């Protein structure tokens, strides 16, 4: 693909040049080619976007629920019509296999938008009787202008997960995509405008997180920030948001999730789940189950089943429909994952497979890392304690149910957890004791629109998706009505 034209900001229904004068490049991680130069939003651009959003939000919030619903449904239709086109762009920008982006990324994002478009008319207040002459009613009102700050692993899906409930509740959103993968968020802005969204209701500001992101979290005109990313960055976003104007926040942060295989489990099923929980999207999924606990007596058999499945991974041309494994999103991220792999070897974990970059004509110019499985791991190893965000599985053994529950919970993270067992009683008993916000029994990874997604502990604050997320983009106003004569004590 030839280099794209320089990408601008999207403010008030159209493209506009950044006033900062700064740019950055976005690359295709499969081959290292530059896709485009992208303009970076500065402080003045954030001010412009906030002013635009304030104007557009008043128009948007004044529309009826059905009017807003119809516009968002039109956007859903356009997304589905352009699924393949958007998936190709997402593959170029992220390196993910087209077989994945064409069936997951845009599809699941559109599903969430459709879900919230349908919920808009159901956003209701309540009526509370006090006595014969007085009652209270409540209204759910939009917050105003909110900001979304996205991660690089699911660019358009995250943009939709954040914008769908925000817009459905009557807010305007300023979205900052990751500087690593900024392209499809700009296309989403075009689609929203084409669907009839008033100018300013969805503005997109590409830029570096430490600058553009901080300007957004500092800005007094923004009522809430929804952030997806790492824990360290999330803490900074939360601190800035609170220090500037006590903004509300939603944080979807990192994870080091446990997958527990019990001794009665079907090991073929367990191996299939472990593969999806570690190597889907080349391991760049926040909910990945990278700590795989297996009974000591099942370890050898489980390892062989995993190795057999690793052999079936197909890396290569990301547009080949048979390819199911792509490069990592960038060269700096590849190097970071390789440092973790080296640390695992240094600390005594045994490499079952991988542990290196992929080599050959298809791989030499890209950010490729081989699917890697470590075994003989212990809880104190760096690869077991810290989020790697790459195709690296760690296998650990255990002896008892109580032991594995304790060890599974021995982490600062609490995003996801899963178990594989044939015993339904044990399934629920154990899941109820695991400290994680998203849990799976005999499956892994599905996050449909109806399910609240978020973590315990350092893995986040608040939830995305589900009814409660729509409500989190509103503020409740209570109004008392008195029909009797008011009595003053003065």
Curated annotation (Swiss-Prot):
Residues bearing the modification Cysteine sulfenic acid (-SOH): 286
Active site annotation, chain numbering: 162 (charge relay system), 252 (proton acceptor), 286 (nucleophile), 464 (charge relay system)
Pathway in which the depicted protein is active: Amine and polyamine biosynthesis; betaine biosynthesis via choline pathway; betaine from betaine aldehyde: step 1/1
Ligand binding (K(+) 2): 246, 457, 460
Residues where K(+) 1 binds: 26-27, 93, 180
GO molecular function: betaine-aldehyde dehydrogenase (NAD+) activity; metal ion binding
Domain of life: Bacteria
SUPFAM superfamilies hit by this protein: ALDH-like
Assembly mode: Dimer of dimers.
Protein task: Involved in the biosynthesis of the osmoprotectant glycine betaine. Catalyzes the irreversible oxidation of betaine aldehyde to the corresponding acid.
Name under which the protein is recorded: Betaine aldehyde dehydrogenase
Organism: Escherichia coli O6:H1 (strain CFT073 / ATCC 700928 / UPEC)
Name of the coding gene: betB
